[in-house]
Regions:
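AAA+/SF3 P-loop NTPase mechanochemical coupling elements
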Residues: 188-193, 228-246
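Conserved AAA+/SF3 P-loop NTPase catalytic/coupling segment centered on the Walker-B
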Residues: 197-219, 254-259
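Conserved catalytic/switch belt of AAA+ P-loop NTPases
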Residues: 212-235
Length: 430
């Protein structure tokens, strides 16, 4: 029953508009908020031809006409307010609904998927990299804003199907985007809004030192603060997407001696693939559906972590070197240390003697670079923080050669080569 004015007419109130949207046979259950796109959708037929689900200006005109002719409600502002309220009370999430509706057939596909479509190696790393990416995408859908900052990066020649893989992995084309070009754009949220898997094509390969730090920071972000144009107040928009990288260049990773832990490179070899992903798109999409069903089975079990195992972290650090430019300075320093006979070195010494800058005073960033190499790339030396005296360089912090390992398997120390163990009979008589 609608509220009336004192003169007996229908009151143009938000309450009356709400009553109509909640009880009218045509409109009841038609308005809902899409929790993925954060837009208002019309999710059932309401008496006229329309395409898509998101509410449009044309939809609003039809609704205004219907409420005016059927109920005498004419306040556009109050009708719009009622639509916002009823939508907020009837939220749905298309990706969650899709994932919850999957049933796995029991055939494992995660372990071999990247080999099947792209010819990647079938090894524990490739398996764990894809598994982590899938579980991260699922967790972002069910828990927007959760911490997940890794990017699966597919590397290989043009035409291998890398971009198509991510597009089909997103299930629906509207859940995929490759339109992200600038990370510092104030409207970057609009590029992410409504998408589940975002491809960053060649973005890392073309990045300089400054922009790669921006990419790392961007991947680590868990939300965007953004005001949708028709809204009054800005809101925290929690991330619901994950990012996949593609590159034709082998050495696409920046030279980062401390590690590029966010990037999981997988080399693809299309000539070794079992099928090309577009040979039969319907079959590929059916495969992807069962891939997600398998991942959902793992997710429901709770027996997973959104991080690599410790042994895979160690492997990743070495594996990433294959995708970085050659580190010539690290090679020069390691070669110098291999022939150096002293027991300790300092940054200035390495800058002058190993890198052949005999007459240059090192700048602060150059000292930091030497330190970075010694702390992350060189083997056989460990850092000491208490300054020691170097005849040519004064008191300096530095690194000392690690002592050779001792053999304690039989409880005795191993005697260094060239020395003889002193027995009791050989001891001096005093």
């Amino acid at each position: 029953m609608l509220e009336s004015t004192e003169k007996g007419g229908v009151r143009n109130s938000i309450r009356n508009c709400l009553t109509v949207f909640q009880n009218d046979p045509l409109l009841s259950g038609a308005i809902a908020k899409n929790l993925l796109t954060e837009r208002t959708d019309i999710i059932k037929p309401i008496g006229y031809n329309r395409t898509g689900t998101a509410i449009t200006d044309t939809d609003m005109n039809y609704l205004l006409l219907y409420l005016e002719e059927t109920y005498g409600l004419t306040s556009e502002k109050k009708i719009a307010a009622a639509i916002g309220i009823v939508a907020n009370e009837n939220g749905y999430h298309p990706i969650r609904d899709y994932l919850n509706g999957l049933s796995w057939d029991g055939t494992e596909r995660i372990r071999t998927c990247l080999h099947h479509f792209l010819g990647a190696d079938s090894d524990p790393y490739t398996d764990e990299a894809l598994r982590l990416f899938l579980l991260g995408a699922i967790h972002r859908a069910f828990h927007p804003g959760c911490k997940f900052e890794v990017m699966l990066c597919l590397v290989g020649g043009q035409g291998a199907g890398k971009s198509t893989f991510f597009r089909l992995l997103a299930v629906k084309d509207e859940w995929f985007s490759d339109d992200l070009r600038k990370l510092d754009d104030d409207n970057v949220y609009r590029k992410l809004q409504g998408h589940w898997i975002i491809e960053m094509s060649e973005m890392i390969a073309t990045a300089n030192a400054k922009s790669i730090e921006e990419i790392k920071s961007f991947l680590s972000r868990q939300k965007e603060v953004y005001k949708i144009p028709y809204e009054t107040h800005p809101e925290d928009r929690l991330r619901q997407c994950v990012f996949g990288g593609t590159s034709n260049a082998l050495d696409f990773l920046p030279l980062d001696r401390s590690g590029n832990r966010r990037f999981l490179p997988v080399m693809v070899y299309p000539e070794q693939a079992e099928v090309h992903i577009l040979d039969d798109e319907a079959a590929s999409r059916a495969y992807m559906e069962q891939l997600w069903a398998e991942a959902m089975t793992i997710y429901r079990s709770g027996d997973f972590k959104l991080s690599f195992s410790p042994e895979m972290v160690r492997y990743l650090k070495e594996h990433q070197r294959d995708f970085m430019p050659e580190d010539t300075k690290a090679g020069m320093i390691q070669a110098y240390l291999d022939r150096y006979t002293g027991s300790m070195v300092c940054s200035k010494q390495l800058f002058w003697e190993a890198l052949n800058h005999s007459f240059d005073e090192p700048k602060q960033w150059e000292i930091r670079e030497v330190n970075d190499i010694m702390n992350h790339c060189v083997t056989g030396w460990h850092y000491f923080s208490n300054p020691r005296m170097f005849p040519e360089y004064g008191r300096q912090k530095g690194w000392e050669r690690e002592a050779p390992a001792t053999d304690t398997s039989n409880g005795a120390e191993k005697i260094p080569e060239g020395f003889v163990e002193v027995t009791e009979q050989m001891e001096l008589p005093f």
